[in-house]
């Protein structure tokens, strides 16, 4: 909730952790009290998380470029993977720590201290807070690698927090944490329709969300820790993951600022024409005659004609396919996890003979179907597409990694972080080399400049531990 943009990490953490009394001393205004409740903090953290994951503002988020769904028209630094000019890694780090994790932590402390809440209300609210916290921690790990974790939210004790090992400390702990709260959704009473903007207080839906997040955690580990991966995935499925698009973890944005989808701000309100569809995704979809093209892209070049801009080059806004009309709508929903994503995870699990209650073909088809339906395709579109020899799971070329990876990546359009992560995990589809820099797709964000300058010793140790603070350093789970 608190938009205190201080470029130095340690200071931003200090100010984010200040008590309400301290805020009163700084900002005392009897007509505008600064005391905030746990539900307001939870709602604010929720929106901050969705906004950061949805935005395509290159000052904050370049994941849609990293996934090569979009490419740029005039200013092409970011599509050539230069993130230093705008301190993008610092912005993402600060947003996720300060405006998401600290607000969630503050909300947690207020729930615990609120004597008016019943034990069931505390249990449910704390479970909701925990799920969004775990989601955010995983996102940070999957962006940077090792990060400050055990010391990160204890600023009075640790002004310069140490980094934790993502493989041996953070991921196992996140799995333990989500295991500890899943059962609480059965009896707990969460934030209701006012505070909970995702499910409006539906705890059954939250339990599916938690299990689907647990599934994601487990699938990330399949190549590096197959034993933990199997047990995590199978227990998540047994407890109940998403089974339709009705389960999707969405934030329905509103038509008026400041509650519109950030995409609308970037693409419409700004009046700018910074992005077109990248040739990477357009070429693949054209080859497959993909029915999602009229939803993903505009037909501004011509009827049923789709042209992608060369990735990493300066591209014409008028002669390349523009981003689809849905992405220009102020109310277009943001997504944290959806049924299509869950289905592709289950397809991989089935290929690995995990006990998940279906075949790889069934889950693969479910993932494609869910994506086409979500974007507005018809039943005939789905039937014809699945029958295409290059889409049909039995006949499509390549290994299961290529089949699942390519269709999974296509389904994550507009969810740049997951699209980038799918490519890192499965190594498909084949990405383009950026035209101007001739650099390949980065494998991680480098650590923020402020960490390098201010938290030097801990940054040095973390950099050495992961194999170097470089865009080409693989994350611990990316071993293929």
Where are these regions (language model features)?
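Positively charged n-region of N-terminal signal peptides that target proteins for export
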Residues: 1-4
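Structured, solvent-exposed acidic/aromatic patches
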Residues: 35-39, 73-379, 394-401, 407
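C-terminal functional modules
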Residues: 372, 376-480
């Amino acid at each position: 909730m608190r938009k205190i943009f201080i470029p130095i990490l340690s200071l931003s953490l200090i100010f984010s952790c200040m008590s309400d009394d301290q805020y009163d001393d700084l900002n005392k205004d009897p007509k505008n009290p600064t005391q905030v409740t746990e539900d307001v903090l939870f709602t604010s953290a929720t929106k901050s998380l969705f906004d950061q994951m949805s935005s395509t503002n290159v000052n904050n988020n370049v994941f849609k470029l990293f996934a090569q769904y979009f490419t740029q028209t005039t200013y092409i630094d970011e599509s050539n993977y230069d993130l230093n000019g705008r301190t993008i890694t610092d912005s993402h780090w600060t947003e996720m720590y300060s405006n998401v994790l600290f607000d969630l932590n503050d909300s947690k402390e207020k729930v615990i201290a609120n004597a008016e809440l019943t034990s069931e209300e505390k249990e449910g609210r704390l479970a909701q807070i925990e799920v969004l916290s775990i989601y955010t921690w995983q996102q940070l790990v999957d962006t940077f690698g090792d990060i400050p974790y055990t010391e990160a939210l204890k600023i009075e004790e640790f002004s310069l927090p140490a980094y934790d090992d993502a493989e041996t400390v953070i991921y196992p702990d996140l799995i333990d944490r989500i295991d500890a709260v899943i059962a609480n959704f059965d009896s707990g009473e969460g934030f209701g329709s006012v505070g909970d903007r995702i499910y409006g207080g539906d705890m059954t839906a939250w339990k599916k969300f938690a299990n689907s997040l647990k599934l994601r955690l487990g699938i990330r580990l399949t190549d590096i820790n197959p034993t933990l991966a199997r047990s995590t995935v199978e227990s998540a499925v047994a407890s109940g993951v998403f089974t339709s698009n009705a389960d999707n973890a969405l934030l329905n944005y509103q038509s008026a600022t400041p509650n519109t989808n950030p995409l609308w701000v970037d693409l419409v309100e700004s009046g700018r024409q910074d992005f077109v569809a990248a040739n990477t995704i357009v070429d693949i979809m054209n080859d497959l005659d993909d029915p999602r093209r009229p939803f993903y892209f505009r037909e501004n070049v011509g009827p049923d004609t789709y042209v992608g801009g060369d990735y990493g080059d300066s591209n014409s806004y008028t002669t390349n396919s523009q981003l689809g009309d849905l992405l220009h709508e102020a109310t277009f929903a943001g997504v944290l996890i959806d049924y299509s994503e869950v289905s592709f995870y289950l397809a991989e699990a089935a290929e690995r003979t995990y006990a998940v209650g279906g075949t790889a073909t069934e889950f693969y088809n479910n993932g494609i179907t869910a994506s086409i339906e979500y974007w507005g395709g018809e039943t005939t579109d789905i039937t014809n597409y699945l029958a295409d020899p290059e889409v049909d799971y039995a006949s499509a070329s390549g290994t299961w990694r290529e089949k699942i990876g390519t269709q999974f990546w296509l389904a994550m359009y507009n969810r740049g972080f997951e699209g980038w992560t799918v490519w890192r995990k499965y190594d498909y589809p084949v990405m383009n080399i950026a035209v101007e820099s001739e650099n390949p797709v980065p494998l991680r964000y480098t650590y923020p400049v402020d960490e390098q300058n201010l938290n030097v010793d801990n940054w040095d140790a973390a950099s050495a531990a992961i194999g170097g603070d470089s865009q080409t350093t693989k994350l611990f789970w990316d071993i293929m």
